[in-house]
Every structure is written in C-alpha cells, then in structure tokens.
C-alpha cells in the first residue's frame, strides 16, 4: 500500500513538473517550398549554406564529421572525420574559416573553408552546443541561458550575456 501511494505521488509530481516546465512557444505558419536529399544517418549538429554548398557538422561518438555536401544531390563531396572520442556540435563560418564545436571535449576545431584542412584549434571551457557568427564575433551556447561571445582569430572571450524572457533566464539555448 505504501509503495502504491508513493508511486502515485511521484507520478503526480512528475506530471505537474512537466506541465509547469515552461510556456508554450508561439506557432508560426510555414510552407515547405522544396525538399532536398540528405544522408539520413547523419546526426546533424550544425549546417551552413556557403558558395552554393552545404557545410555540415555531424555528431555522435565515433561518427562525428565535417562534411561538404552538394545540396542538389545530397552527395558528400568531402568529409573530415573527427577523432572517435569527440562529439561534433555547432558550426559557424567567419572569414573563410569553419569553426566546429565539440560537445564535452573542450575543443573548437578550425578549418579552411576551401580545403577542409584543419588550420588550428582552441580550448573551450564547458560544453559546446550551438555556434553562430555575427557582426565579426562567434557566439557559443552551452545548453544554459548564457551566450558567450568570442573574437574569432584568437578565440578570446569578449562578452557573456544571459538570455531572459522578462526576468526569467531562458535555459537550454542551442
């Protein structure tokens, strides 16, 4: 009897917690204009359209890559495999350099966008989730409400901001 009561309370608590997890997002209308072929086994973490090509960062340990993809056919034109113990994440382009985050490995890989050759790497404190280039800076998300802004050439941290909805931080930014 005690176990059943306990499980009932736990179920109710879980349900209430899930219901109060946050406000629903706004619905926005959309229209699918075109569908392009894509490797369904690729665990896409970052995607950039540049010079008529797609550059894609894929994740999963032992399977993470940086790919150059023909958007018309879905064919992978070139591919760089990451070390097996690295999980690829977000991808951004700045000054013909591709920057690829790693999830928990504390690294940012830098590639020449013309050749996909590795031209460097930088340490990254914390987890890497999403990456964007904006106004000459790289913006990193780490799954929290915080965004970190970096100078691309040296990957020096120049600012941090907390994203809020009113007075509440918005968690799980990617």
Functional labels for PLM-detected ranges:
Residues 42-46, 86-93, 126-134, 169-174:
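Repeated scaffold domains used in trafficking and secretory/extracellular systems
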Residues 51-52, 95-96, 135-137:
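Short coil/turn segments that connect the beta-strands within blades of beta-propeller domains
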Residues 35-40, 79-84, 120-126, 161-171:
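Surface loop/turn motifs at the tips and blade-to-blade linkers of beta-strand repeat domains
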Residues 16-18:
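C-terminal motif of bacterial Sec signal peptides marking the signal peptidase cleavage site
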Residues 33-65, 79-92:
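Beta-strand-rich domains and repeat architectures in extracellular enzymes and scaffolds
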Residues 22-41, 71-77:
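A short helix->beta-strand "capping" segment at the edge of beta-propeller domains
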Residues 69-74, 112-116, 151-155:
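Short loop/turn segments that connect beta-strands within beta-propeller blades
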Residues 55-61, 98-105, 140-144:
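Conserved beta-strand positions in repeat-built beta-propeller and related beta-rich domains
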């Amino acid at each position: 009897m005690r176990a059943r009561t306990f499980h009932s309370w736990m179920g109710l608590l879980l349900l209430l917690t899930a219901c109060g997890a946050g406000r629903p997002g706004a619905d926005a209308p959309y229209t699918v204009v075109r569908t392009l072929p894509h490797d369904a086994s690729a665990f896409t973490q970052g995607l950039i359209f540049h010079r008529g090509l797609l550059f894609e960062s894929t994740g999963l340990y032992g399977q993470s890559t940086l790919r150059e993809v023909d958007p018309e056919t879905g064919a992978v034109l070139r591919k760089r495999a990451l070390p097996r113990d690295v999980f690829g994440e977000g991808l951004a382009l700045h000054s013909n350099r591709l920057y690829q985050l790693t999830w928990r490995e504390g690294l940012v890989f830098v590639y020449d966008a013309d050749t996909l050759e590795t031209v460097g790497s930088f340490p990254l404190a914390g987890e890497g989730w999403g990456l964007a280039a904006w106004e000459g800076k790289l913006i990193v998300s780490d799954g929290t409400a915080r965004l970190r802004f970096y100078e691309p050439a040296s990957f020096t941290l120049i600012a941090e901001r907390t994203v809020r909805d009113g007075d509440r931080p918005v968690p799980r930014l990617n």
